[in-house]
């Protein structure tokens, strides 16, 4: 996985709640032009749980096509880490095979939600998916959403026994987990999945981030990651601190509710539309977002 900075892309909808493909392509191009190494379509932030199977595949396809046809400022190609998560192993399997077939660089697979499998069940789930493809696989641990954690011994076993399981997205909120994983396996790539901990994870063995805030501020997220990779601790910390209030504001309600509204307020998407059961943010949240974006000079 030859990338470090990436954004968990939102999925823009039209007023009729169909996917706004033109807006989606424009958002991806903005990521490319502002220095991100990779994009992550149809993860949690992309509202994958309320997309149809066909829509899910189409979003992956748009991301791959856009990255293939749009060069970065350094004349390279932005990578695509395709979200293939589902609470049904068979559906994740289908999405993983599709992503590989059309050219995804790697896949991100969240633990099955609602089912609450045992650790053996998690192992078999990830093993089955990883062995169905040849491209790299990133585990995704976010117990606040899935109801179950990939325990450290399970994650290490998957990394050691399945050759193309290369990385894990850490959204558990536990730096202890990060340090433990890195201590036992230096080559197991750890990506921050929690913007408030980006700096801390990068300096505790992490090698990159998958950011929600990056939808809005890809240049600053990219700069912070690059500073961390060069071991420029203080410079990276200054950027992390600069983003503190924005990180806070974007998670006052369930993600991706605030980030989609912020993107709308910033003029980056036309419609801040959500599919039920997600609904628009409260008036208080909108006011907070407006105030925060003004502080960052995103809006007047």
From Swiss-Prot:
Amino acids binding pyruvate: 45, 210
Native species: Helicobacter pylori (strain P12)
This enzyme's EC code(s): 4.3.3.7
Catalysis performed (reactions): L-aspartate 4-semialdehyde + pyruvate = (2S,4S)-4-hydroxy-2,3,4,5-tetrahydrodipicolinate + H2O + H(+)
A Gene Ontology cellular-component term: cytosol
Homology family: Belongs to the DapA family.
Functional note: Catalyzes the condensation of (S)-aspartate-beta-semialdehyde [(S)-ASA] and pyruvate to 4-hydroxy-tetrahydrodipicolinate (HTPA).
One GO biological process term: lysine biosynthetic process via diaminopimelate
Site (Part of a proton relay during catalysis): 44, 114
Assembly with partners or alone: Homotetramer; dimer of dimers.
Keywords: Amino-acid biosynthesis, Cytoplasm, Diaminopimelate biosynthesis, Lyase, Lysine biosynthesis, Schiff base
Enzyme class per UniProt: lyase
Compartments where located: Cytoplasm
Annotated GO MF terms: 4-hydroxy-tetrahydrodipicolinate synthase activity
NCBIfam families: dapA (TIGR00674)
Gene3D superfamilies: Aldolase class I
Ranges that cross the membrane: none
Catalytic residues (positions): 140 (proton donor/acceptor), 169 (schiff-base intermediate with substrate)
Name the record gives this protein: 4-hydroxy-tetrahydrodipicolinate synthase
Superkingdom of origin: Bacteria
Cited CDD domains: DHDPS
Pathway noted in the entry: Amino-acid biosynthesis; L-lysine biosynthesis via DAP pathway; (S)-tetrahydrodipicolinate from L-aspartate: step 3/4
């Amino acid at each position: 996985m030859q990338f470090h900075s990436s954004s968990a892309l939102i999925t823009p909808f039209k007023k009729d709640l169909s996917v706004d493909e033109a807006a989606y392509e424009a958002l991806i191009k903005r990521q490319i032009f502002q220095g991100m190494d990779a994009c992550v379509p149809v993860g949690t932030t992309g509202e994958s749980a309320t997309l149809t199977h066909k829509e899910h595949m189409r979003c992956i396809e748009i991301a791959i096509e856009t990255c293939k046809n749009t060069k970065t400022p350094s004349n390279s190609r932005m990578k695509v880490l395709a979200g293939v998560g589902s609470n049904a192993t068979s559906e994740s399997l289908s999405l993983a095979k599709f992503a590989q077939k059309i050219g995804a660089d790697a896949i991100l697979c969240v633990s099955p939600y609602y089912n609450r499998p045992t650790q053996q069940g998690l192992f078999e789930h990830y093993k089955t998916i990883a062995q169905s493809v040849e491209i790299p696989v990133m585990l995704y641990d976010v117990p606040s959403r899935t109801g179950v954690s990939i325990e450290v011994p399970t994650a290490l076993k998957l990394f050691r026994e399945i050759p193309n399981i290369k990385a894990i997205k850490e959204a558990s909120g536990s730096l202890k987990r990060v340090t433990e994983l890195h201590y036992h396996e230096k080559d197991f790539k750890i990506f921050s999945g929690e913007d408030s901990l980006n700096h801390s994870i990068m300096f505790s063995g992490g090698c990159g981030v998958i950011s929600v805030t990056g939808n809005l501020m890809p240049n600053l997220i990219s700069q912070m990651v690059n500073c961390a990779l060069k071991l420029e601790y203080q410079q990276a910390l200054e950027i992390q601190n600069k983003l503190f209030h924005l990180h806070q504001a974007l998670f006052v309600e369930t993600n991706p509710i605030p980030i989609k509204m912020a993107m709308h307020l910033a003029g980056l998407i036309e419609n801040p539309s959500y599919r039920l059961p997600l609904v628009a943010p409260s008036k208080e949240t909108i006011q907070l977002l407006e105030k925060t974006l003004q502080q960052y000079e995103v809006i007047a």
